[in-house]
Amino acid sequence: NSMERVEELRKKLQD
């Protein structure tokens, strides 16, 4: 799911 990937990337940016 692309949403899954987006969530992962957003998490990385949050750091």
From Swiss-Prot:
It comes from the Eukaryota. One of its GO terms (biological process) is killing of cells of another organism. Coiled coil: none annotated. Belongs to the parathyroid hormone family. Keywords: Antimicrobial, Chitin-binding, Fungicide. The keyword Hydrolase does not apply. Induction: By ethylene. Has antifungal activity against A.alternata, A.cucumerina, A.niger, C.gossypii, F.oxysporum, F.oxysporum subsp melonis, F.moniliforme, T.cucumeris, and V.dahliae. Has no chitinase or agglutination activities. Disulfide bonds: none annotated. One of its GO terms (molecular function) is chitin binding. This is Chitin-binding protein HM30.
